[in-house]
A protein has these predicted regions:
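Membrane-integrated ABC transporters
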Residues: 1-36, 52-60, 78-82, 86, ...
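Juxtamembrane helix-loop junctions of ABC transporter transmembrane domains
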Residues: 4, 32, 36-48, 67-114, ...
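An intracellular "coupling" helix at the cytosolic face of ABC transporter transmembrane type-1 domains
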Residues: 14-16, 106-107, 123-132, 136, ...
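Transmembrane helices of ABC transporter permease
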Residues: 17, 21-34, 67, 134-189, ...
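Hydrophobic alpha-helical segments in the permease module
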Residues: 60-75, 168-171, 242-258, 275-300
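ABC ATPase nucleotide-binding domain helical subdomain, centered on the C-loop/LSGGQ "ABC signature"
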Residues: 95, 314, 395, 403, ...
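Cytosolic ends of transmembrane helices, especially the final helix of ABC transmembrane type-1 domains
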Residues: 213-216, 240, 288-317
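Helix-to-loop junction immediately C-terminal to a conserved catalytic motif
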Residues: 384
Length: 551
């Protein structure tokens, strides 16, 4: 409960500058509701007047028509201002999330499941819309109209006001609270399974080409279907509770209307109120449940919204693995030195490296070999300052790596991952990554060196040809050479190749390795689990059991 109150308080603080707009939404909601209740009550009143021999007042009918039109306008105003706040805040949340991710990367994306992040950016942020558009205004509206209605019923009878108060309280407070506690564990389980399924689906989508080549796509589809059915079962459990809640809400309304009508009948029989007033109060009561039903439906939507808020604030509160506390800039990286370095990943106790002493020098191709998971890539991620060491010292030239500006350091290093990263952009944009100082002549010069110039120029629009991971116009070997082009265009001091040939045949492996040897100037790190891949390196190190030694 305390956790939920903190979340709600924090969400309100996040949009406090928009509270006047929320008040506008409440204003339109309250007056729209009062008009909704007033119209049938006025029609009943006019009907009784006609039955008692009175004349139908045309002016009253005109007023009713105006009120009916106004009801539509008030309804529009309520939704417009409520959703204006919601979508404005959602945009702010997304900006905050992307800004935070920029501060957390690359370590965050290195350790975070992409499916979970996509779910957070898309589905979780969308779920917050329920809080901003369908929680604050309805709660305030419900509170105001309940006070107005209770005072109205009290004008006729204490018993009627007590019945109304009881029914409204059950609908707006008791039912939401009871079902909120029941829904919470189901929603948490549902979130976990949806996150897992999203990740599994994305992995399947990205690896579809490999699945087709291996002929195991049918088995993968079966697993996807199985996972989907599990998610659907969890969804059904939530839906059942939601249906049960609706049933209790309408059962409460049914008993409430019956009790109200019975008391009305007794009061008429005792001549404490007139038949006309009894019918009007019953009509008002029967048409007054909309805001309270909206509140009774909150547990599901609000439960999801609060769950989403937890995930969102968890990310926004996350500390960066590496702060950008350094302000030094290295002119050129000539030497990398590790002295008594201990390292473990954030929030993990197991040491990956212990008392590591190591020295890498400029203008050498360094081979790093070892079993999968031995720490080869981790060693390079420490050099790139994705993570900081637990203890010891890492120096670039004579400067402590902690004193060097992280972004400036990473500008000096070109990292080529195992799997080529292709963005849904033109070939030029994929290669330059926003660097407008790189000319087309430079791109084509490097393309010729990497034996890709003819292939690029033969595409539909040359460098302006749009490519993406789905529209494959390059082979695996050519995609790896595109990555190499991207690295060479960066003109870095250090090149890190992480298993660059693990997915290539012998011919393409030979092409890539020769291109690396011929074109990469400066310090080159070649990570592989195969000795044959690093055989041409100037020096080879083996990473094993938390140590790195020359072989």
């Amino acid at each position: 409960m305390k956790d939920s109150i903190k979340l709600v308080t924090r969400l309100i603080n996040f949009m406090k500058n928009l509270l006047p707009v929320i008040l506008l939404a409440v204003f339109f909601a309250v007056f729209g509701f009062l008009i909704t209740v007033y119209i049938p009550a006025k029609i009943i009143s006019l009907g009784f007047d006609v039955l008692n021999g009175g004349k139908l007042n045309i002016f009253s009918l005109i007023i009713l028509v105006i009120l009916a039109v106004s009801r539509g306008l008030f309804r529009y105003g309520e939704h417009y201002f409520g959703h204006y706040v919601a979508f404005k805040v959602l945009a702010d949340f997304r900006r905050e999330i992307f800004a935070k991710l920029r501060r957390l990367v690359p370590s965050k994306l290195d350790s975070q499941d992409s499916g979970a992040l996509l779910k957070l950016i898309g589905e979780d942020v969308e779920a917050l819309e329920v809080f901003f558009a369908h929680t604050l205004a309805p709660i305030t509206t419900g509170l105001i109209v309940s006070i107005v209605l209770i005072l109205y019923y009290l004008h006729y009878s204490l018993q009627l006001s007590l019945i109304a108060l009881t029914v409204y309280f059950i609908l707006a407070v008791i039912i939401p609270n009871v079902f909120s506690s029941k829904l919470k564990p189901h929603l948490e389980i549902q979130q976990q399974y949806r996150k897992s399924y999203t990740s599994y689906f994305l992995e399947s989508l990205k690896g579809m080409k490999d699945l087709l080549q291996l002929g195991v796509e049918k088995e993968r589809f079966k697993n996807l279907e199985k996972e989907s059915k599990i998610v659907n079962r969890k969804e059904r459990n939530v839906a059942k509770l939601n249906f049960l809640q609706f049933s209790f809400s309408f059962l409460t309304i049914g008993f409430g209307v019956f009790a109200f009508a019975f008391v009305d009948f007794v009061l008429v029989k005792k001549e404490l109120i007139s038949i006309k007033d009894a019918v009007i109060t019953l009509v008002v009561f029967s048409s007054s449940f909309a805001p309270f039903l909206e509140l009774s439906r909150l547990p599901l939507g609000l439960g999801r919204a609060l769950q989403a808020a937890r995930q969102t604030f968890r990310l926004l509160d996350e500390k960066e693995a590496v702060g950008n506390e350094g302000n030094k800039e290295v002119e050129k990286i000539d030497e990398i030195k590790f002295e008594n370095v201990d390292f473990s990943y954030p929030n993990r106790d197991k040491l990956i490296f212990e008392n590591l002493d190591l020295k890498f020098e400029d203008k050498k191709i360094v081979g790093l070999v070892g079993e999968s998971g031995s720490g080869k890539s981790t060693l390079m991620k420490i050099v790139m300052k994705w993570y900081v060491a637990k203890s010891g010292k890492i120096s670039l030239n004579d400067d402590d790596i902690l004193d060097i500006d992280s972004r400036k350091l990473q500008e000096k290093i070109a990292y080529i991952p195992q799997f080529p990263q292709i963005f849904s952009q033109t070939i030029r944009e994929n290669l330059t990554l926003g660097n407008k100082n790189i000319t087309d002549d430079e791109i084509l010069y490097i393309a010729e060196k990497c034996r890709l110039k003819d292939k690029i120029l033969s595409t539909e629009n040359g460098l302006d040809t749009k490519i993406n991971s789905e529209r494959v116009i390059f082979s695996s070997g050519e995609m790896q050479r595109l990555e190499l082009m991207r690295a060479l265009l960066k003109k870095s001091d250090v090149y890190i190749f992480d298993e660059p040939t693990s997915n290539l045949d012998t011919l393409n492996e030979s092409i890539i390795l020769n291109l690396i040897k011929e074109n990469c100037k400066g310090m080159v790190f070649l990570i592989s689990h195969r000795m044959s891949t690093v055989s041409f390196a100037d020096v080879i190190y083996k990473v094993e059991n938390g140590k790195c030694f020359k072989i």
